[in-house]
């Protein structure tokens, strides 16, 4: 199921997102039902809206996201999120992220402490990546990997 909240106003987006996240978490915690999938992917675009590094600790949505980031994997909940500025995300959410994909960003962003462990050559690459090109980081990989997704078939030919 996909729930697109892009056309809703900010408060309604927060309400819908928080309600859906809580419902998924509660369903997985209950665990008595056989009709619930083993894995549920919660995809969040612009994660800083809900798990900002400066969000108040009392934020119910932040608490839910921290629960999902910290305990969700053991329940079969996978948090997949996209954010242009990694430094804007809450530290505990970032700390529980295994795989990270870095797209093009600016020099100001890569100069922040979040990027200190990334070699300078990759930081420089991040400021010049093309659309569809990413740098992948995962603990299972010995070094960062540069990945380039091909253009869609309909865009590969000049007349087609």
Located regions from the model:
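P-loop NTPase motor domains
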Residues: 1-67, 74, 134-140
